[in-house]
Design a protein with these regions (language model features):
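Catalytic cores of carbohydrate-active enzymes across secretory and cytosolic contexts
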Residues: 1-180
Length: 180
């Protein structure tokens, strides 16, 4: 251990790929334009980050994400033969100011994607609470040979089609890096 020190394990995450353009701007102005490669000492500048600027970057990223998800929902609805009037709800789906929980990954049973659905009435109550708005965005694919993973997706999609919750509980098809 002393001979091979390990500073961190990232599981292959490449920060510059996944950080939004807005947050990238804050990091560049705080840590430096090369924040992706900055050393520990350079990262100490993050303790002086402008909290308002960081929050504004987060909020702008979230608005962009909501717009992108709405576009995806509309596109897939039209591709499935739904009319524009049937998809009017998409214009108000998701609220950029609500607590947003995203689950976007490979759908496998051990990841417990459908755990929320084990108490559907409780989930409906949470989704309907306008005083404490919360919303969920699901996306992902199952391995072609994983029937259980496909069943998880079916359960999530079925719940997301409920008109009472579809504005706060969505499944986005064709998960890819653009959506991620």
């Amino acid at each position: 251990v002393e001979e091979t020190p390990v500073g961190s394990i990232t599981n292959g995450v490449h920060g510059a790929t996944w950080v939004s353009a807005e947050v990238d701007g804050v990091l560049s102005s705080t840590v430096g334009d090369d924040w992706q490669w900055a050393d520990h000492d350079a990262w100490q500048a993050i303790t002086h980050v402008d909290g308002d600027a960081l929050w504004q970057a987060h909020a702008a990223s979230k608005v962009r994400m909501v717009d992108h998800v709405r576009d995806r929902l509309r596109h897939h609805g039209l591709a499935q033969g739904r009319s524009a009037s049937e998809l009017e709800w998409v214009d108000t789906a998701l609220d950029p100011s609500a607590l947003t929980i995203c689950f976007a990954r490979r759908m496998a049973t051990y990841k417990r994607a459908a755990l929320l659905l084990s108490q559907p009435e409780r989930l409906r109550a949470l989704l309907g609470d306008d005083d404490r708005p919360i919303q969920f965005i699901f996306a992902g694919k199952a391995h072609p040979a994983d029937d259980h993973g496909k069943e998880l997706i079916r359960q999530i999609v079925t719940f997301s089609h409920d008109p009472a919750v579809r504005h706060r509980f969505v499944f986005v098809e064709d998960y890819d890096m653009a959506l991620a």
